[in-house]
């Protein structure tokens, strides 16, 4: 079985891992109630989406 010829340096290892990171969710302000919510999703506090009430609270 093949083995690495040289040890992978810290810099090369870290450069390879720069893409393995968590993404921050896109938060926007709800136009109806003003609370922060995830973009393109129903507001948890008032239950509206695109100006319409989707969930009865």
From Swiss-Prot:
SUPFAM superfamilies linked to this entry: Zn-binding ribosomal proteins
Pfam families: Ribosomal_L32p
Cellular component, GO annotation: large ribosomal subunit
Residues in the signal sequence: none
UniProt KW keywords: Ribonucleoprotein, Ribosomal protein
Recorded GO MF terms: structural constituent of ribosome
Any GO BP: translation
Keyword Iron: no
InterPro entries in alphabetical order: Ribosomal_bL32, Ribosomal_bL32_bact, Ribosomal_zn-bd
Family, as annotated: Belongs to the bacterial ribosomal protein bL32 family.
HAMAP family attached to this UniProt entry: Ribosomal_bL32
Name the UniProt record assigns to this protein: Large ribosomal subunit protein bL32
Organism: Geobacillus sp. (strain WCH70)
Gene (name only): rpmF
């Amino acid at each position: 079985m093949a083995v690495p010829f040289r040890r992978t340096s810290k810099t090369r290892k870290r450069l390879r891992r720069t893409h393995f990171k968590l993404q921050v969710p896109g938060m926007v302000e709800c136009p109806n109630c003003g609370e922060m919510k995830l973009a393109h999703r129903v507001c948890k506090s008032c239950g509206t989406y695109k100006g319409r009430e989707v969930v009865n609270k």
